[in-house]
Amino acid sequence: MASTTGALILAAGKGTRMHSDKPKVLQTILGEPMLRFVMDALAPVFGDRVWTVVGHRADMIYAAFAGEDARFVVQEQQLGTGHALQMAWESLRAAGLDRVVVVNGDTPLLATETIDFFLKESAEADIAFMTLTLPDPGAYGRVVRHNGHVAAIVEAKDYDEALYGPEPSEINTGIYALRLDAVESLLPRLTNANRSGEYYITDLVGLAVAGRMNVLGIQCGEDPNLLGVNNPAELIRSEALLRTRLVIGHIEGGVLIHAPETVRISPRATIEPGAEIYGPCEIYGTSRIARGAVVHSHCWLRNAEVESGSEVKSFSHLEGATVGKGCSVGPFARLRPGAVLDEEARVGNFVEMKKARLHKGAKAGHLTYLGDADVGAGANIGAGTITCNYDGKNKHRTVIGAGAFIGSNTALVAPVTVGDGSLVGAGSVITKDVPEASLAIARGRQTNLPRKPKA
């Protein structure tokens, strides 16, 4: 793609029909904001030459894409799509663009291949836009043609058969290709003389036709992938289509997915050929499942890594965690951000880890909390062990040495260290460091007293 072509995403609207406090483009699909799907479709074609117009709750959009190389333009007042283009014009010109493709931020089904096709078909046009023919055009803008040639785009609420003739079934998808030199003279001529009182980008078409510019309406049949998402029902339908598309792609790539209709996978997740997934299961964010790893049913993963030969058993919850090779997790385990399992480590049922590391071969079989902890290779953590890491103000670390054995129902009050090869007796409350190769017992002596007989 020529370096003088860029893209503009319109994402400033409120999306009132979503009945949500957050902007429409941040509604989630497969754990990701809807806007991300549009950005991902454009990136292979335009690289970093993509701008997004934001307005309503722009702060939330900035936060959602913090740390990413996204370019934003602010539309302080949401006065329509034409006004949004005007707000972005200086940025587009400063980037040295000759052409710009304009898309709406609520089209998560948009495919890269569609954009490639559109650019080739519109190469000679001053203004081009994509159209669909629908049995029920609904609220979409109508495409008016005279003798097959585009005459105008008229918004549904403004359509007047006395002026334009019988209402057509061909609609505007909201995807445009604009030659900047041609459009620059038209932008100041946009008006808000319509029922919405907004400046429509669609009015550029009528102005261009009147100016005898080359205007093309490129027909794309009845492709539903080009339609926007306007309400919760449409969001759910789009998510279902995207879920199926992604799951099928992984299966065709060599991933074994059982009950695929119940599996949800983020577009940013990586699942290597030879991995095995059992549904229902949810894999979100930048999670990575390596070849030979198995994730069982009813698991939830976000930004987690599972290396080859590892098994995540049912009902486990992993977020921001790393599971090394040959590990076992669960069932019913929770690995929170910063949890790391080195090779052949094991975490069993009802074990929670946070900012904690189990080195090679270490294991915590059940009913344990390991927070802000480092557990040495081969250590064994007994049932009911708790690292008491919070003193009410600050978090503190617990270090358990290689080969150590922590007896059941032990409380390790951080900061504290248990040395290599040491044993802590069951039921202990450890508040002081335990030297290497030591036995530590910190509990009250058992007393047996005679029991009074019942009266």
From Swiss-Prot:
This is Bifunctional protein GlmU. The active site is at H366. Binds 1 Mg(2+) ion per subunit. UDP-N-acetyl-alpha-D-glucosamine binds at residues 10-13, 24, 75, 80-81, 141, 155, 172, 230, 336, 354, 369, 380. Pathway: Nucleotide-sugar biosynthesis; UDP-N-acetyl-alpha-D-glucosamine biosynthesis; N-acetyl-alpha-D-glucosamine 1-phosphate from alpha-D-glucosamine 6-phosphate (route II): step 2/2; Nucleotide-sugar biosynthesis; UDP-N-acetyl-alpha-D-glucosamine biosynthesis; UDP-N-acetyl-alpha-D-glucosamine from N-acetyl-alpha-D-glucosamine 1-phosphate: step 1/1; Bacterial outer membrane biogenesis; LPS lipid A biosynthesis. NCBIfam families: glmU (TIGR01173), PRK14356.1 (NF010936). Catalyzes the last two sequential reactions in the de novo biosynthetic pathway for UDP-N-acetylglucosamine (UDP-GlcNAc). The C-terminal domain catalyzes the transfer of acetyl group from acetyl coenzyme A to glucosamine-1-phosphate (GlcN-1-P) to produce N-acetylglucosamine-1-phosphate (GlcNAc-1-P), which is converted into UDP-GlcNAc by the transfer of uridine 5-monophosphate (from uridine 5-triphosphate), a reaction catalyzed by the N-terminal domain. GO terms for cellular component: cytoplasm; membrane. Residues 254-455 are annotated as: N-acetyltransferase. It comes from Nitratidesulfovibrio vulgaris (strain DP4) (Desulfovibrio vulgaris). InterPro entries: Bifunctional_GlmU, GlmU-like, GlmU_C_LbH, Hexapep, Hexapep_transf_CS, MobA-like_NTP_Trfase, Nucleotide-diphossugar_trans, Trimer_LpxA-like_sf. The gene is glmU.
